[in-house]
Amino acid sequence: MNPLRKKRLLIIVALLAGVGLAVTLALSALQENINLFYTPSQIANGEAPLDTRIRAGGMVEKGSLQRSADSLDVRFVVTDFNKSVTITYRGILPDLFREGQGIVALGKLNAQGVVVADEVLAKHDEKYMPPEVTKALRDSGRAAPAASPTPVKQG
């Protein structure tokens, strides 16, 4: 093999190795940022992976909200009306967080079946429901409770 061909081959191999490394790094970064959505039924049935960041959503069960007296720790139960899952969260809940309304929690599922959330998202008005929660509730055969109409001020 003459020196020119050898040099070209070396450049092509180096370029392919560089492209392969770049693709590997990009895919690894994307994989870390993927948060799959799971319903309480899927979590209770063991379909959600342990110690992997997931999104869990459903309706907050009435009477399930427990706040710690001396910290920002909160514990509540989310349901899709078939099964329920407990979610713990340390921080200030969104202003629109209420029992009986839809939420999505981002966090990790531990071995006890509790989602340890680092972020809680609440619906932003009385008619909005996160798409994943709406689909999960529809698939479970139950619809989200209808929001009461807001009185319109006349005058």
Swiss-Prot record:
The gene is ccmE. GO terms for biological process: cytochrome complex assembly. Heme binds at H124, Y128. Pfam families: CcmE (PF03100). NCBIfam families: PRK13254.1-1 (NF009727), PRK13254.1-3 (NF009729), PRK13254.1-5 (NF009731). One of its GO terms (molecular function) is metal ion binding. The keyword Cell membrane applies. It comes from Pseudomonas syringae pv. syringae (strain B728a). Keywords: Cell inner membrane, Cell membrane, Cytochrome c-type biogenesis, Heme, Iron, Membrane, Metal-binding, Signal-anchor, Transmembrane, Transmembrane helix. Gene3D superfamilies: Nucleic acid-binding proteins. This is Cytochrome c-type biogenesis protein CcmE. It is a single-pass type II membrane protein. Residues 30-155 are periplasmic. Belongs to the CcmE/CycJ family. It is found in: Cell inner membrane. GO terms for cellular component: plasma membrane.
